[in-house]
Swiss-Prot record:
Assembly mode: Heterodimer of ArnE and ArnF.
The UniProt record lists the keyword Lipid metabolism: yes
Annotated protein name in UniProt: Probable 4-amino-4-deoxy-L-arabinose-phosphoundecaprenol flippase subunit ArnE
Transmembrane segments: 42-62, 65-85, 93-112
A single cellular component GO annotation: plasma membrane
InterPro entries associated with the record: EamA_dom, Flippase_ArnE, Small_drug/metabolite_transptr
Lineage of source species: Bacteria, Pseudomonadati, Pseudomonadota, Gammaproteobacteria, Pseudomonadales
Pathway field: Bacterial outer membrane biogenesis; lipopolysaccharide biosynthesis
GO molecular function, one term: carbohydrate derivative transmembrane transporter activity
Pfam families tied to this protein: EamA (PF00892)
UniProt family annotation: Belongs to the ArnE family.
Keyword Cytoplasm: no
Residue ranges annotated for the EamA domain, each copy included: 46-113
C-alpha cells in the first residue's frame, strides 16, 4: 500500500508540474484575450486537480511511513519532470542532466534500502 501511495504521489505531482507548464504555454497564446480566456483553459484546472490529489496521496502516505523515509523519494519527481520536459516539451537534456538524474536515482535507491 505504501509503494502504491508513493507512486500515486509521484505521478500526481509530476502531472501537476507538466500541467503547470502547459498552462503557461497556453497563456502565452491567449495573453491578449485576457483572464477569461486563460481561465477557460483546462490546464490550470488539471494542475490544481493533480497537485491536490498528490497532496492527498502524500498525506495518506505519511500516515503509514516516517517522513524521513518518504520525503527523499520525492526526489524522483526531478527524474519524471525532466523526462516530461524532454519528451513532452522537446526540451534538451544533456549529459550533465542525465548524470544528475542518475545520481538522484542512486541516492533514492541508497536511502530506500536503509528505510
Amino acid at each position: 500500500m505504501s509503494a502504491a501511495l508513493l507512486l500515486a504521489t509521484l505521478l500526481m505531482t509530476g502531472l501537476g508540474q507538466v500541467a503547470q507548464k502547459l498552462t503557461v504555454e497556453h497563456w502565452r497564446l491567449v495573453a491578449a484575450d485576457g483572464w477569461t480566456a486563460r481561465l477557460r483553459s483546462p490546464w490550470p484546472w488539471l494542475a490544481l486537480l493533480a497537485l491536490g490529489l498528490g497532496l492527498l496521496c502524500w498525506l495518506l502516505l505519511l500516515q503509514r511511513v516516517e517522513v524521513g523515509s518518504a520525503y527523499p523519494m520525492l526526489a524522483l519527481n526531478f527524474v519524471l519532470v525532466t523526462l516530461a520536459a524532454r519528451f513532452v516539451f522537446d526540451e534538451p537534456v544533456d549529459r550533465r542532466h542525465l548524470a544528475g538524474l542518475l545520481l538522484i536515482v542512486a541516492g533514492v535507491a541508497l536511502l530506500g534500502r536503509s528505510a
